[in-house]
Amino acid sequence: MRRNVDDGLTHSSRRRFLAGAAGAGAIVIAGCTGNDGEPADSPSDSAVGQIGSGRAGRSAPGGTPIDDLPDLEGELELYSGRNEFLVGELISFLDDTYPDFTPSVRYGSGSDLVNTIDTEGSGSPADVFYTVNAGNLGALADAGRTQTLSTEIQETVSEEFRTDQWVGTSGRARTVPFNTNAYSESEIPTDIMAFPDFEGDLGWAPTYGSCQAFSTAMRIFEGEDATREWLEGVVDAGITPYADEFQVAQAIANGELDAGFTNHYYIQRVLDGSPSAPIETAFTSGDAGAIFNVAGAAVVDTAPNPELAQHFIRHLLSAEAQEYFAVETFEYPLIPEVEPVGDLPTVDELDVPEFDIAELSNVRATIDLMRDVGIST
């Protein structure tokens, strides 16, 4: 059951949670971690800029509120490839909302947790696998370690962002951030394959999971030979490697680079701390440089509490959770009733290529190709 009025967590606490997420004083992420492409626990205390103006004054989100969902009751073992700094507050909110709900979270990289579940076999305690990209979800499903999600969960999200075995809970778009003192948007190529001939200074983060997923998409669309030629081309042109994509975006804003390849939210985080920074977002069109990837969740096939696992995943698609992803992590919500934060195109307005994002699970061949070209991964 939920807490009653005397317990102090009612509709008013839901409003406080949403206000805390949407207000200009909300925590701002200013850094990122390594290989899975997940931002890290580095809050910014700088003034709120472009994104802050988008966060302030947002109306109540649409979608299904948690009050209309089944209560969460019982013990849930969550294996999370998402950083605790990003999702810990949301999980704590659900924990506080339901007094009979006890979540236990094991954090780690998504790929490591896939291997852990596989190694644990039928004795795995994991109920839910929650991770930062579709590749990890696809890998677990391909190993036969997931179970079919409820029809309600599947119908909540557009079919391109889920299968019957896993569902996306938030999304991110690949972009080309550029320095506005050096280039105008019209001068940035809209074809990702044109960048080996780009005259400006480029940057990327090839050890980063999102960058490797982008390169995997190029292998799928263009073939291995063309991808090898592209990789060799940008390396020969002097592309500068960075440890993560926030550093790429920051270097562009600082004038150290002219353009680069990152997820959309890194530009927004730079602008959130420095609203006048000379950085803007450009998009390529319908190619590997324009893929849209998702964080998402699956119920493990041997889940000790599969019904609770299904209900928990449904809560990740609630109005409150989707608003949280929009205003706290600057991701794209995946239910149509909640809009992204800031001056961003909607998911429907993005010119993304049509393909099965679960194919991004085959990253090993991409890493081998990048290393063969001489790129450190």
Spans of features found by a protein language model:
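Periplasmic-binding protein-like
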Residues: 159, 172, 231-234, 241-242, ...
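Extracytoplasmic ligand-binding site segments that recognize negatively charged/polar headgroups
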Residues: 81, 85-88, 111, 124-257
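Mature extracytoplasmic/periplasmic domains
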Residues: 295-357
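Early extracytoplasmic/lumenal segment of secretory-pathway proteins
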Residues: 51-138
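N-terminal secretory signal peptides
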Residues: 1-12
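Conserved C-terminal helix/tail region of periplasmic/extracytoplasmic solute-binding proteins
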Residues: 359-377
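N-terminal Sec signal peptide cleavage junction
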Residues: 31-32
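A ligand-binding cleft/hinge motif common to bilobed small-molecule-binding domains
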Residues: 135-139, 259-278
